[in-house]
Regions:
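Transmembrane-helix boundary motif in ABC transporter permease subunits
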Residues: 99-129
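Periplasmic/extracellular loop-to-transmembrane helix junction in inner-membrane transport proteins
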Residues: 3-4, 37-102
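Short cytoplasmic-facing helical segments at TM-TM junctions of multi-pass membrane proteins
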Residues: 174-213
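Alpha-helical membrane-interface segments at transmembrane helix boundaries
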Residues: 87-95, 99, 122, 129-132, ...
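Transmembrane alpha-helices
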Residues: 161-164, 197-231
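Transmembrane alpha-helical segments of polytopic membrane transport and secretion proteins
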Residues: 1-23, 275-293
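Hydrophobic alpha-helical transmembrane segments of polytopic membrane proteins
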Residues: 241-281
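Generic hydrophobic transmembrane alpha-helix motif, especially the helices
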Residues: 126-170, 177-178
């Protein structure tokens, strides 16, 4: 099998797997809803109540959510389908997430290199890096927003900083582990050639860290979307998926399908950035294999 046909097969397999996962989620959703409606909101054969109500306000039908995506909604002076409305909002969120992902990756890799170079830095910084992730984001986001506005920073910068806070951690930890992964024999070989530390870093340690970096990038990319949405909700911005979710939550009793549709849009955005990192991983690894061959 040629490399091109193998790539096409993998892509087709990924599409089929994603489609089957969506179908399974819809079947479970509708099956749970049907069961609750048939039994009066209890587990079959028992008097135990289901954990989530199955009425149309709490759990609208999946078909109703899908139909809402093509219904019209007001956007300023114009009217457009909800799917297009969410796509416009997602574009703003994607920009904020991309900035946060970039900054978080740079900071994470920079911290990893610093901790690799000086062991005292690892002992001093790594515990604090771990502790930083115990601070609730919902409490930290308003602080970052207030600080940013006092400094005169645009809202997109403050939101991106919230994404950065979430993304740097997995990159820093995984990058450090990857940079430390080369065998001691390989490191000693570089030393025997009198290779400078920088040469060892770029020629040996960074290539060895690739299998550790890309999984971290995937996690960081999805976290950047979460951070951007939380930031939009905290800052009260007029754009982004976070704003759409907040607005639809306030009108939940009237249009519950719109809130679910906006949540689906956020999930799709997360899957999109995850897919972009996966594609980059395949391209980089394929090029590496070609060079080795």
């Amino acid at each position: 099998m040629s490399a091109r046909s193998e790539t096409a097969t993998k892509a087709l397999r990924s599409v089929v797997t994603a489609a089957l996962a969506i179908i399974l989620i819809v079947l479970v959703w509708e099956g749970y809803k049907w069961t609750g409606q048939q039994t009066g909101g209890t587990w079959p054969g028992t008097g135990i109540e289901l954990p989530v109500s199955t009425d149309d306000i709490i759990m609208p039908h999946a078909s109703d959510i899908a139909a809402e995506l093509v219904s019209d909604i007001r956007d300023g002076r114009s009217t457009l389908p909800l799917s297009v409305f969410l796509l416009k909002k997602a574009w703003f969120t994607l920009q904020e997430a991309a900035i946060g992902f970039f900054l978080g990756s740079v900071i994470g890799i920079g911290l990893a290199v610093l901790m690799l170079r000086w062991r005292v830095a690892e002992r001093g910084l790594l515990p604090w890096i771990n502790v930083s992730q115990t601070v609730p984001l919902i409490a930290l986001a308003p602080i970052i927003v207030t600080w940013g506005r006092n400094q005169g920073l645009p809202d997109i910068v403050s939101i991106s900083l919230i994404s950065t806070y979430l993304t740097f951690f997995p990159v820093a930890v995984s990058a450090l582990r990857g940079l430390q992964s080369p065998d001691s024999a390989h490191v000693e070989l570089m030393r025997s050639y009198a290779a400078p530390w920088r040469t060892t870093l770029f020629k040996l340690r960074l290539p060895a860290a690739r299998p550790y970096l890309f999984p971290a990038f995937k996690i960081a990319a999805t976290l950047s979307v979460v951070g951007a949405i939380v930031g939009e909700i905290s800052i009260g911005t007029k754009t982004g998926l976070g704003r759409a979710i907040l607005e639809f939550a306030q009108r939940y009793a009237v249009w519950p399908e719109r809130l679910y549709a906006s949540v689906v849009g956020a999930a799709v955005l997360g899957l999109f950035v995850f897919g972009m990192i996966s594609l980059a991983e395949r391209l980089v690894l394929r090029r590496t294999d070609e060079v080795v061959a």
